[in-house]
């Protein structure tokens, strides 16, 4: 549990295991920060988790700025990283710099972008401009249309080789950490051993330098929990129970009771 503010320089190889979780608003970010996570990702997964979209492609930079502002206000200890959403960096370093700067001004202390060696030149420009970058290889949700769905990556020798090459390319241009998503555990282990920056797994086994999960999966608010996630609570049932009781008490006029209001 961090007892001081986490910085990107605190994330070093061999210093983990590092604990990351997503958060998208002030109250949940405040809770996970108090719980002692090392890092909070304001993920573009908010499109699916919070906004009800079928994937992350509809998330805008304005969405990310607003949610990053809320999370940053609530997290005095954890490192806050914001996702760069679809088509905010693919068009080149100039656009990436301008868009990343908006997220930094919103309170992010680093940005995360998906992709490997094909975006190394973009990452390099951001890092040289003083913007810390977290890489993201393996399953890239922003490529879901090209991939034909949310499918495991790294099952072939060619894919495995590409993942290792991508990790090294991102390491070479200065990322401080790399998310490795939904790849075989043995491949994640090889990727982790190939670079001297921390790897953070999601659905990629125990061999990375840390783990990250979507908060709603952790607390039981998701409609469906992925096979690689663990549900530690059932908050959805608690909310349902509480609101159903509220509905019943209002309709039977049991609420508000005398202690809930004042009279002159």
Curated annotation (Swiss-Prot):
Function: Catalyzes the reversible reaction in which hydroxymethyl group from 5,10-methylenetetrahydrofolate is transferred onto alpha-ketoisovalerate to form ketopantoate.
Active-site annotation: 181 (proton acceptor)
Gene assigned in the entry: panB
Family: Belongs to the PanB family.
Cofactor binding, per record: Binds 1 Mg(2+) ion per subunit.
Principal subcellular localisation of the protein: cytoplasm
Enzymatic class: transferase
Entry-linked HAMAP family: PanB
Protein name: 3-methyl-2-oxobutanoate hydroxymethyltransferase
Cellular component GO terms, alphabetical: cytoplasm
Pathway: Cofactor biosynthesis; coenzyme A biosynthesis
Protein keywords: Coenzyme A biosynthesis, Cytoplasm, Magnesium, Metal-binding, Transferase
GO molecular function annotations of the record: 3-methyl-2-oxobutanoate hydroxymethyltransferase activity; magnesium ion binding
Oligomer and partners: Homodecamer; pentamer of dimers.
EC numbers for this chain: 2.1.2.11
Signal peptide bounds: none
Top-level taxon: Archaea
Residue positions binding Mg(2+): 44, 83, 114
GO biological process: coenzyme A biosynthetic process; pantothenate biosynthetic process
Protein residues bound to 3-methyl-2-oxobutanoate: 44-45, 83, 112
Catalysis performed (reactions): 3-methyl-2-oxobutanoate + (6R)-5,10-methylene-5,6,7,8-tetrahydrofolate + H2O = 2-dehydropantoate + (6S)-5,6,7,8-tetrahydrofolate
Compartments (UniProt record): Cytoplasm
Cofactor(s) recorded in Swiss-Prot or TrEMBL: Mg(2+)
């Amino acid at each position: 549990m961090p007892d001081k503010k986490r910085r990107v320089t605190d994330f070093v190889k061999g210093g983990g295991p590092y604990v990351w979780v997503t958060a998208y608003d002030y109250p949940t970010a405040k809770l996970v920060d108090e719980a002692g996570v090392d890092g909070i990702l304001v993920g573009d997964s908010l499109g699916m988790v919070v906004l009800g979209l079928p994937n992350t492609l509809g998330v805008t930079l304005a969405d990310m700025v607003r949610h990053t502002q809320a999370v940053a206000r609530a997290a005095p200890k954890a490192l806050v990283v914001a996702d760069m959403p679809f088509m905010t960096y693919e068009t080149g370093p100039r656009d990436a710099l301008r868009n990343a700067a908006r997220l930094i001004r919103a309170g992010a202390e680093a940005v995360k972008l998906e992709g490997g060696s094909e975006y190394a030149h973009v990452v390099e420009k951001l890092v040289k401009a003083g913007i810390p970058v977290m890489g993201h290889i393996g399953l890239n949700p922003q490529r879901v249309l090209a991939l034909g769905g949310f499918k495991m990556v790294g099952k072939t020798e060619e894919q495995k080789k590409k993942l290792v090459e991508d990790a090294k390319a991102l390491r070479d241009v200065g990322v401080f950490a790399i998310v490795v998503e939904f790849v075989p555990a043995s491949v994640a282990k090889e990727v982790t051993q190939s670079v001297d920056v921390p790897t953070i797994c999601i659905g990629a086994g125990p061999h990375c330098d840390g783990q990250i999960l979507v908060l709603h999966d952790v607390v039981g608010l998701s409609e469906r929990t992925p096979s690689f996630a663990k549900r530690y609570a059932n908050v959805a049932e608690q909310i349902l129970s509480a609101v159903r009781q509220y509905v019943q008490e209002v309709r039977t006029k049991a609420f508000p009771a005398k202690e809930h209001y004042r009279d002159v």
